[in-house]
Curated annotation (Swiss-Prot):
GO molecular function, one term: oxidoreductase activity
Binding-site residues, NADP(+): G150, V151, S152, L153, M154, G155
The organism of origin for this protein: Helicobacter acinonychis (strain Sheeba)
NADP is among the record's keywords: yes
Source superkingdom: Bacteria
Enzyme class: oxidoreductase
Enzyme Commission number(s): 1.-.-.-
Sequence similarity: Belongs to the nitroreductase family.
InterPro entries per the UniProt record, alphabetical: NfsB-like (IPR033878), Nitroreductase (IPR029479), Nitroreductase-like (IPR000415)
Assigned keywords, A-Z: NADP, Oxidoreductase
NADP among keywords: yes
Role summary: Reduction of a variety of nitroaromatic compounds using NADPH as source of reducing equivalents; two electrons are transferred.
Name of the protein in its database record: Oxygen-insensitive NADPH nitroreductase
Amino acid sequence: MKFLNQEKRKQLLNERHSCKMFDKHYTFSSEELEEIAEIARLSPSSYNTQPWHFVMVTNKDLKNQIAAHSYFNKDMIESASALVVVCSLKPVELLPNGHYMQNLYDEPYRSRTLLSFAQMLDLRFNHSMQKLESYILEQCYIAVGQICLGVSLMGLDSCIIGGFDALKVGEVLSQRINDPKIACLIALGKRVKEASQKSRKPKNHAITWL
């Protein structure tokens, strides 16, 4: 297995940025789209619950319909080559005795994992569906981070979008997907200009060593 050296890793991490405008003439190859989809699919999650569904939007008309309900992100989404709609599963789908969880794992992993997960629902969440929903969103955001970093490693760009009307976007997608519950959007494409210098808190404000 080959790894990037430290200098290259640092360069890629610094070059990754939230791209606010994409090259509207750039078109993803089928290989690029498949690779992005696989990056998403392989994302880690607590208990390997994978409580998500990724909708890869490449249809321009559909993408623009979504953009129309994305407030100040409209122009940026319209310029993107593709849009990932990150949908979260509903809390009821993660109940240990439900169809999804019962069919997610193979034995003997299933029995011990579902037992441990049920204990977590009791001890950490006190069987609160609201807390379970927050847990599901946490897992989705882990996947979002992996997608954005993975796309950067491909030499491409992304922008995480939280500013959109979830109900309206859901209505657009509901014509093709049954009752989607949307966590966030990720615009994908190729930048039209170089990013400004990355701005982050100094190390001593961001990190504590013990």
